[in-house]
Structure formats: C-alpha cells, structure tokens
Amino acid sequence: MAAAGGAVLLLVLATATSVTGQHDYSDALHKSILFFEGQRSGRLPPDQRLRWRRDSALNDGATAGVDLTGGYYDAGDNVKFGFPMAFTATLMSWGLIDFGRSFGAHAAEAREAVRWATDYLMKATATPNTVYVQVGDAFRDHSCWERPEDMDTPRTVYKVDPSHPGSDVAAETAAALAAASIVFRDADPDYSNRLLDRAIQVFEFADKYRGPYSSSLHAAVCPCYCDYSGYKDELLWGAAWLHKASRRREYRDYIKRNEVVLGASEAINEFGWDNKHAGINVLISKEVLMGKDEYFQSFRVNADNFICTLLPGISNHPQIQYSPGGLLFKVGNSNMQHVTSLSFLLLAYSNYLSHANVRVPCGTSSASPVQLRRVAKRQVDYILGDNPLRMSYMVGYGSRYPLRIHHRGSSLPSVAAHPAQIGCKAGATYYASAAPNPNLLVGAVVGGPSNTSDAFPDARAVFQQSEPTTYINAPLLGLLAYFSAHPNLAQSDLLYD
C-alpha cells in the first residue's frame, strides 16, 4: 500500500512538464514582496519602487473622525477590506517567523511589507472595543474602473463594536498583530511590544462580544468577504497566536478549554482568509513536535489527518484534486489562494516533523517530511513556470507571464503618462481592451487555472483567473524564502528520507 501511494505521489510530482531548470527563487521572492508596494494605499514613501503608483485615499476615515489612511488594497479594486488584510499580515509574519533566516537579504523588505499592514491595523484598532474593518463601498467601487489615485466613489467607513460584533475579523486582526510582534521582537522591540499589547486588547474584545461580522455588516462585506465559516475558528486562531507571542498560560488554557466548543477537531482541509481550521492545527502542533507541550497532542492528530488529505495516492479520503499538470485544485474562485496557503502549511509542517524526526501516519501508509516539501515545491514550481503552458503565473517573472491582469491601477495609464483624471465609466475602454496592461505589477500572482484542465485565458474580464490578491502572495513569501535557501532537494528524496 505504501509503495503504491508513493508511486502515485511521484507521478504527480514529475507530471506534465519537462521544464526542470532551476528557478531563481530569490528573484521570485524579491518580486513577490515588491508586489505589495503596488497594493499600497495612502501616502507613498520616498523609497517607493513601483513608481507608476502615486498617493491615494488620503482622507480615508475622515467621515468617521478617524485616520484610516494606509494599508493595502486587497486585489484589483480600490476597497480596503480589513479581514483579508489582517490574514495577509498574519501569513507574511508566519513565513518570517518560521523561515526568517532563509529570507537573507530580503528580510528587511519583507518586514516593511508586514509593517505597512500592521501600521494600518493599529490605526483601525486605536478606539477601545472597536475595529474599523472596511473603507470603501464595494458595490460602487466595483461598478467603476478607475485608478486608486482618481477614485471618487464613497469611502464609507465600516466598524464592529459591542453592538455590532465581529469576532471573526477582530480575532484575525489580533492574530495579525500578535504574529507581527514576534517578527519585530528583535528588529524593533518597542513596536513589537505595542503590537502585542494591542493584540491582547483586540482579542479580549473579539471574545467578549461574540458574533460574525457578516451578520453585523452583511450589506457591506457580503458577498466579497462574507465569513462563511463563522467566527469560532478565528477565536482559536487568535488565541494560538497570542499564546505563541506572549507565552501566557491563559491563552494555553483558553485553547484547551475551547478546543471542542470552538470546533478545533472539525475535519476541514481549508485554510485561507475565511477558514483557519487547518492552520490552527498545524500552528499548535509545532508545540508538540518541537517538544514544548504534549498538552496539545490532539491538535497534532488533527494536523496529521489534514496533511494526509493533501497527499496524492496516500490518503484513503482525498479531499484535493490535482490537475494533469500537477496543480493542486479546489473548487471556487482564485485557485492560487488555495495553492499557496496549503503549500505553506505543507512546508511548515514538514519542518516541524523533521525536528521531531517523525513521519505523518496516513492509514496503512505514511509520509516523510521530504514528501511534504516535494509537494509544496512542485506547487511553487508550477506557479513559476513548470506547467503545461510553460508560463509563469507571477507577473514579471520569467519570459512569459500574464499580461492582462484584472487590476485597475495596472491596466489604466499611470498618472505620469495620463495626468488627467480617468473617471468611473471612462475606464471601461481600458478594461475592455485586448492590449497588455501598461503598468507592470511586478510580483503579482494571479488566480490561475480555475479548473483541472490547466487552461488560462489571460483575459482581464475573467477575474477569477486573472486577478491578483495579497493573500495569494502572503504565504508565498515563506515558501520562496525557504526554497531560495534550499533549492536542491535530491531526486532520491522524492519519496523517502
């Protein structure tokens, strides 16, 4: 049984491409970080490297009497959605925490990418028992095609508070601040302490006033970032990061006390801005596998079960498909968000397993840490060009990549090239154009193939496949950092250590 499973896994790892040249993971890492500069909102710093971008949304928050300038636009639009932005910051931080040394010369710019998000999240949580969770009217914004520098749609401010709870977005924000506090512990101790103090306050608010923000703010946040999985996973996720950042026993006790109540054992192999179940189990399992806390053994069992569902030919209950070209595939929009987030968990867990010198039990078979790393690396290589179309899905990497991405700022002339305002409906001409985008959003990874055929239309209108998001790139940073430091996993290690 083990041999058969290994053979299928080897087939998936080797399938559908003869392009096996070494990728420049360090260059891809640099570009993936650079992408975040293209997503910046607010007043841009003098060292801004994507020069076609200019200042934007300088009055955000003014209608509510608060300063909400800064932060990131989530994707190809001009709305600031707090839920995916917080998740983006959490995942960038996790990559730096686990693979910080592998970032090498790119560590400082990666920290700056985190700080751009956390500076905003600190503003969004400056009022006690309140989290400002969105700036902009998604429906009005999505009816326009205009540069962020020009946008004239309403910058409506949305918040959660005791009367309108949002435990999901608040707990994710707490997780982001806590994770970032670890990132800045040595580089900027004062900032680190402020991040952790705020994370503690925000989590207390999230836990005390329970409820989904999708109920409190349904008309504003749905369907774009409705929390379909509920808020319980975010409460555990936030507690896990606070435990990791503070080492306070109260968070350890909170996790164990609420493990069943908040659904930690639910067999869900999802991980993304909405659903944190798999991430919770992998993150907490590190405590067990690193020999720090046997108290969390149940989370390791959950993590093992989750990991097995991702391994082709090994699981008796696979929940993941792979395309003929070897791409991990889950039904829904923007498949690359699943590819990068699940690959990150595979890589992180493989390192925890390696430290403990153990394998993942999968029924009558088992998987080695190297097998997990191989699956993760195969996904990264697919993104960078080892796929049936022989194209990179990262803009600016390789000789062939998406040219017509679904992104307002990239597809419209820059302010330097076209100083006059391009109004809401005037941008439609550029949206419908078959011409390549005039501004290169370097490092952007698009949604990619949307089914198991490995097809990609490179069409601006097909946003499910052509739109980049911050939460596609966020987990990719850690992956690229690791493989830039460890590019060669011997072919003999494909199946077993």
From Swiss-Prot:
GO molecular function annotation: cellulase activity
Primary enzyme class: hydrolase
Active site per UniProt: D77 (nucleophile), H406, D458, E467
The organism's place on the tree of life at top rank: Eukaryota
GO cellular component: extracellular region
EC number assigned by the record: 3.2.1.4
Known catalytic reactions: Endohydrolysis of (1->4)-beta-D-glucosidic linkages in cellulose, lichenin and cereal beta-D-glucans
Cellular location(s): Secreted
Record carries keyword Cell wall biogenesis/degradation: yes
SUPFAM superfamilies assigned to the protein according to its UniProt record, in alphabetical order: Six-hairpin glycosidases
Glycan-modified residues: N451
Main subcellular localisation: secreted
Swiss-Prot/TrEMBL keywords: Carbohydrate metabolism, Cell wall biogenesis/degradation, Cellulose degradation, Glycoprotein, Glycosidase, Hydrolase, Polysaccharide degradation, Secreted, Signal
Range of residues in the leader sequence: 1-21
One Pfam entry name: Glyco_hydro_9
InterPro entries on file: 6-hairpin_glycosidase_sf (IPR008928), 6hp_glycosidase-like_sf (IPR012341), Glyco_hydro_9 (IPR001701), Glyco_hydro_9_Asp/Glu_AS (IPR033126), Glyco_hydro_9_His_AS (IPR018221)
GO BP, sorted A to Z: cell wall organization; cellulose catabolic process
UniProt family annotation: Belongs to the glycosyl hydrolase 9 (cellulase E) family.
Protein name (record): Endoglucanase 17
Organism, scientific name: Oryza sativa subsp. japonica (Rice)
Phylogenetic classification of the source organism: Eukaryota, Viridiplantae, Streptophyta, Embryophyta, Tracheophyta
The gene coding this protein: GLU13
